[in-house]
From Swiss-Prot:
Biological processes annotated in GO: L-methionine salvage from methylthioadenosine
EC number annotated for this UniProt entry: 4.2.1.109
Function field: Catalyzes the dehydration of methylthioribulose-1-phosphate (MTRu-1-P) into 2,3-diketo-5-methylthiopentyl-1-phosphate (DK-MTP-1-P).
One Pfam family from the record: Aldolase_II
Organism ancestry: Eukaryota, Fungi, Dikarya, Ascomycota, Saccharomycotina
Species: Saccharomyces cerevisiae (strain ATCC 204508 / S288c)
One GO cellular component term: cytosol
Name the UniProt record assigns to this protein: Methylthioribulose-1-phosphate dehydratase
């Protein structure tokens, strides 16, 4: 086995190389990463190496040998697959690692994200929904010093940026969202999809699933005439009555 292949071969199902393949297959079946769209990157906390899904691979068929491995310090590739080129998302993933101290980033072409990008302006908003409690607030508990989640009564806000011809051209707008929304763990790209990050791949997965649930709920609320961020008890003021 070559020194490069040692980086991606492990019997541990939680090894980044194995986990990226497992999750990409799952996300394909969720209809989030079809037609080679989307991608995942995970930082190995033991080695400080970035594991990155390549460009142009069918996500349900991806294997560890398809992955790129990059040194987090030098940003040099330690391993490159023969059949694929680096994802155009790579600069965006690196920005999340460097500016948000992310441990993993998930990019999907979720239809819910695309539809919400058409329904909302500069930001996605939803309030007073239980699932919001799965999303980090960006604040720290003064007593426990642990990160705090949003509460049921909070409004989740996710910035929406405009799509570009190439994904690496999104980098300037991504940096701007980091400044304008310092507590966000996601950004929606209009008519494209969503990027979600977290301190670990487990957290990023939870955030992504919760946000997708909330976006789907927001779409259904819009269909009923209910603003997703309306106050508690105000729903019936907006509700579209079904035809008899």
């Amino acid at each position: 086995m070559s020194s490069q292949d040692v980086l991606i071969h492990s019997d541990d199902p939680c090894h980044p190389a194995n986990l990226i393949c497992t999750l990409c297959k799952q996300f394909f079946h969720n209809n989030w990463c079809t037609g080679t769209g989307g991608g995942i990157s995970i930082k190995d906390p033991n080695t400080n190496y970035y594991y990155l899904a390549p460009s142009g691979v069918q996500k349900e068929k991806m294997i560890p040998e398809d992955l790129f491995v990059m040194d987090a310090q030098t940003l040099e590739y330690l391993r490159s697959p023969k059949l694929y080129k680096p994802s155009a998302c790579t600069p965006l993933f690196l920005a999340c690692y460097q500016k948000k101290n992310a441990g993993a980033i998930i990019h999907t072409h979720s239809q819910n994200a695309v539809i919400c990008s058409l329904l909302f302006g500069d930001e996605f908003r939803i309030a007073n929904i239980e699932q919001i409690k799965a999303i980090p607030s960006g604040k720290v508990d003064p007593v426990t010093k642990k990160p705090m989640a949003l509460s049921f009564f909070d409004t989740l806000k996710i910035p929406i940026i405009e799509n570009m011809a190439h994904e690496d051209e999104l980098i300037d707008d991504l940096h701007k969202t980091f400044k304008d929304y310092p507590d966000t763990c996601a950004v929606i790209v209009r008519r494209h999809g969503i990027f979600v990050w977290g301190p670990t791949i487990d957290k990023a997965k939870i955030f992504n699933e919760a946000i997708d649930y909330l976006m789907e709920l927001a779409i259904k609320m819009y269909q009923m005439g209910i603003p997703p961020d309306c106050g508690i008890g105000e729903e019936k003021k907006h509700l579209k009555m079904a035809s008899p």
